[in-house]
């Protein structure tokens, strides 16, 4: 499956290329042409633990990575960084449920994505034969910069 730019569907990239590029050359975002291309039975993940669920879903959405490769990336990205093995537990509040997105290292919901991004970027680099180190520059007044720096901290190749 090739990802395509939101501004020009003829600009395509593999999932590894899209991860490393971030944006398409025309400034568009990379998206799948159609979710129909991803055949996925969501009932298979309903009773999985968070790590297994993350592995299964991400390996379907990012086909350049095998399920075994993704399992290692998920393990390395999340293990020991969150207050609970569930990462973002769903807790009952009366008759409702709340998804707690503040259990990561910086208490920001962005920890979920930014704990995986450096692992995905370094693995994409290897797949594409890129030798350059990854440099992240942040300028923010909010929690994004802190979450990004925490996610990339001590990750080899960054």
Regions found by a protein language model. Give the residues of each.
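PLP-dependent amino-acid enzyme catalytic core
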Residues: 1-158
